[in-house]
Amino acid sequence: MVHPVQVGKRTRMSFSRLKEVGQMPNLIEVQLDSYDWFLKEGLQEVFDDINPIQDYTGNLNLEFVGYKLDLDSIKYSVEECKERDSTYAAPLKVKVRLLNKETGEIKEQEVFMGDFPLMTEQGTFIINGAERVIVSQLVRSPGVYYDMTVDKTGSKLFSATVIPNRGAWLEYETDSNNIIYVRIDKTRKLPITILARALGYGTDAEIIEFFGEDERLKATIEKDNTKTREEALLEIYKRLRPGEPPTVDSAESLIESLFFDAKRYDLSRVGRYKFNKKLAIHLRITNQIADQDIVNPQTGEILVQKGEKIDKDKAIEIQNCGINEVYIKIDDKSFKVIGNHFVDIHSLVPFDISDLNIKEYVFYPVLKEILDNYADEESIKEEIRKNIYRLIPKHIIREDIYATINYELALSYDIGYKDDIDHLGNRRLRSVGELLQNQFRIGLSRMERVVKERMTIQDQEVITPQALINIRPVAASIKEFFGSSQLSQFMDQTNPLSELTHKRRLSALGPGGLSRERAGFEVRDVHHSHYGRMCPIETPEGPNIGLINSLATFAKVNEYGFIETPYRRIDPKNKRATNDIVYMTADEEDLYVIARSDEPIDENGYFIDDKVTVRAKEEVLVVPVSEVEYMDISPRQLVSVATAMIPFLENDDASRALMGSNMQRQAVPLLKPQAPIVGTGIEYKAATDSGVLPKAKNAGTVVYVSADEIRVRRDSDGGIDKYKLLKFKRSNQGTCINQRPIVSKGEVVAKETLLADGPSTDLGEIALGKNILMGFITWEGYNYEDAMLISEQLVKEDVFTSIHIEEYEAEARDTKLGPEEITRDIPNVGEEALKDIDERGIIRIGAEVRSGDILVGKVTPKGETELTAEERLLRAIFGEKAREVRDTSLRVPHGEAGIIVDVKIFTRENGDELPPGVNKLVRCYIAQKRKISVGDKMAGRHGNKGVISRVLPEEDMPFLPDGRPLQICLNPLGVPSRMNIGQVLEVHLGLAASKLGWHIATPVFDGAIESDIVDCLRKAGYSEDGKTVLYDGRTGEPFDNRVTVGYMYILKLAHLVDDKIHARSTGPYSLVTQQPLGGKAQFGGQRFGEMEVWALEAYGAAHTLQEILTVKSDDVVGRVKTYEAIVKGENIPEPGVPESFKVLIKELQALCLDVKVLNDDNQEIKLKESVDEDADELEVNIEGTENQPEEKEEKEKEDSDEYDDLREEDVEPDLEELSLDDLDLDDFGDEH
């Protein structure tokens, strides 16, 4: 039944029936933990990989001994970095040791290796003043993958791919003649026996003896024309290095370096783990019949007798006592199974070695050697430490290759299984730490080359580590990664939810990943292994669908980069659900039978029903209780945070839920946030983890509260913690960040208590929109096709008003002709335009500005021309001051307006770091209050989006029997075909809850059901169907039928009409075609395309058509004359020839076709090449292109991955659209 739940400072009435076991992890731990790992272990690994650097003679040795990030000498705090456009970073200092082997001299130095960007507490980076997020990348895990295809004759053909982290690939394939081929590093294919010979089994007899009798092997040997190891080596060398003279030695060293050199071939920890998992012998012999006695080589005891079935425990025992070859019986044939000889070290070493921290399997021959040669505990441990890279090799070894070949042979006997590459057990996550590590490795290897060169060039006696090391390549690769990698994205800061989701995003794109064009349908599809790991709902619509995903609420990432999800253990003895929680990867989960979290259990954890619905791999089955092994821990574990915020998600169609999840991220923070009446209970957790809210670092008592600062006296030592609040700051997306205190003086706070609300939060809960009284009713066609009719009350009472802040900057640079100057003294500008400009030439704070107003007065020196006598005279009289300058002031762009809220000035004198050539930088911040208006886009949480079509006076809106007018009318036809019934349930429950004064939590898949809603309506005194009589506000008459009315949570989205509306009379033109540019950012025109031309042709509107195709577009002469005629009030002249026609003729002439234009009398018409000289007297530039207003926003769009809804023509102001001002056309008319 409904029960109260305390969420922060608010009580919600919850409808959940399940007691949740286990806590949701910190929602941004993916970012924090990964970066933490990088600083503690990742960096060290890279240095270990590269140590030591030797010169070509082997005399000098350079080693990186240790490193530290100098956190005490961070230049600026996070806030200062944002203000000063600098990077939040700490210097990385590395201890370097140089050993000269000849003289035995050792030199040690601490070397500065560049500033290393630090992660903020919120999981972001500040790079050049912009807050950025590194998105985690989903890639194929290194490992061995087998696949099967069926050919025309119906026979099964098996293939395999051996994928390292970096290094040469091996690919096996079988053709229809049963011959097995191998491709080494994507070259032409060779019979696989050539590879086997080259690795050591030279003759046919050796191969057959080692791999066992097999039809396909024999067919391959027949095809193979090499017969010895030497021949095989030469054959491989010819394939890999065509054109070089083959010798056996060079072939041997090629194979060695290709596969068995740790610097060239790296499996990585995860690759070794996947190899050992796939190639372990125990998996393939479990449940098979032994064809020979299997004897323990240490003790001589018979483990399995011939003809006996091998069970799972026996199979593991066989593997761990070092047996690597087992004969099994299949269809009366004997088949030899070969493993890769790795064993569990803990079962073989007789004492406890947990302090060595070895989690992986180890290579048995090396371990046996150690155990045979040493007896006492200490020396064995010491030897294991010394030989760790032989025990757990980082590269592939011969045994691995033999095992992969054997697996390929075994598949045709139905031993082993093929892999599904879209399974999350075979895809792993590269998070910040690993991406950074790879980048750092690239930088270090570039540096290694430089060091080696310097070692040979410089004098070995006086050389120092500092002189050898050049940190440029390292610093450059890190900078390149943060600045321009596809995975380093400009943070989506529209609201706290969009921040949080951006940090939890998983992308399959990026370097080393997929590309949009190549990604097929399978990769994008929902897979059964996504359950509890990746959200099946939240993904963008458009070309990236399914390639960009979101982490599920309870998911964690393990040390290998695989995503894990938690399950409750079911006690195997008495089959009761325990509170033990186990995190499992996707391939572990496939081994178990897992019950739903809402399966009925009693208070002791026993199942109530005899039969239970379960998941086993991709099947959903009903099984007896005795077979259940685990149980989900929460119904919301399969969805992401944004999706878990949709109430009644279970009643919505999936595609609408997808839109609902995505649109919540676009909700603009409103002036007065309001938490939803009908929530899901996850709002508090999402807001607290998103990083926008200040929390108490220590327990204590609040001693001071003001709008911009909170002070807390610590309980521990009586000291004071100060918390500065952000006031009206601009976010990355231009929305407003403002924090408001929610504690009062004297309040006692515990550690981690929220002290203030941020943008879009209300008492610590995410509050993206408003609770609005609405009804499903049509009104005079104004809500046709998803349009919305709203009441003027929403405008008057600032219900949907938001604040937007834009930043504009002007810089004074040094030019060839002298420095630019920021000044109030601007040529040809009247006093009226300068009324709000102070004596420095900068606008005052608080001034109201409109488009075209000056923000920063700036003049640039003009080029010197030959002076006339009069000018020389003036120069002589007035001195230098009459020198020509032109006005290049920063003005408010077209269509913008607002109030100046802040001005920042950076100069060299004040010690600010400015880019080279810049003397002074001024930033102005303009704030606008945007009320809701016609054309704004609004949406509910169920994918029900619409555009406002009309703002109706309150008195005309339909009203309830108690006289309250509705605030919004939605079209009832928007519900049935879209199947998002959740919105109707939300409206009913909202109606009852607002009357009862409740806030409600109805968690996804575990929320209120129909009977609960009916009970609430009854309790609130409404009719049970949730409908009521509505009266027409204009006539006072009741409408014919009763109408569903209630409270719905509605968001105002970032697609605001003010940003989209755009008009142009004249403006920039494309250079080649002379047609107007397109798009608001380029101040372009409206495209009149092919189909629009057909429409005019169809109605015979010849003059309109001619005008549009010529003087309004690319008839250069005509448009100047036309403008002149309009200004002077004369008739519009005849149009001339469009520029694109001239371009067409030039194209044809470029193809060597002699094209001429003839008139009726077959006389050639000369096409004028340029504008009439006299047409340029007007003070308007029509033939050239204006400087295009470049909006910062556009650059940011490019940075982020969100340009799903941009069309190509919106983005590409191509090379040909350079502005004419960039060209040096001094004689091209007046300067304007």
From Swiss-Prot:
Signal peptide: none annotated. HAMAP family: RNApol_bact_RpoB. The RNAP catalytic core consists of 2 alpha, 1 beta, 1 beta' and 1 omega subunit. When a sigma factor is associated with the core the holoenzyme is formed, which can initiate transcription. Belongs to the RNA polymerase beta chain family. Its EC number is 2.7.7.6. The lineage of its organism: Bacteria, Bacillati, Bacillota, Clostridia, Eubacteriales. Residues 1170-1232 are annotated as: Disordered. This is DNA-directed RNA polymerase subunit beta. Keywords: DNA-directed RNA polymerase, Nucleotidyltransferase, Transcription, Transferase. It holds the Pfam family RNA_pol_Rpb2_45. One of its GO terms (molecular function) is DNA-directed RNA polymerase activity. One of its GO terms (cellular component) is DNA-directed RNA polymerase complex. InterPro entries: DNA-dir_RNA_pol_bsu_ext_1_sf (IPR042107), DNA-dir_RNA_pol_bsu_external_1 (IPR019462), DNA-dir_RNA_pol_su2 (IPR015712), DNA-dir_RNAP_su2_dom (IPR007120), DNA-dir_RNAP_su2_hyb_sf (IPR037033), RNA_pol_bsu_bac (IPR010243), RNA_pol_bsu_CS (IPR007121), RNA_pol_bsu_protrusion (IPR007644). DNA-dependent RNA polymerase catalyzes the transcription of DNA into RNA using the four ribonucleoside triphosphates as substrates. Residues 1171-1180, 1199-1232 have a biased composition (Acidic residues). Residues 1189-1198 have a biased composition (Basic and acidic residues). It catalyses: RNA(n) + a ribonucleoside 5'-triphosphate = RNA(n+1) + diphosphate. NCBIfam families: PRK00405.1, rpoB. GO terms for biological process: DNA-templated transcription.
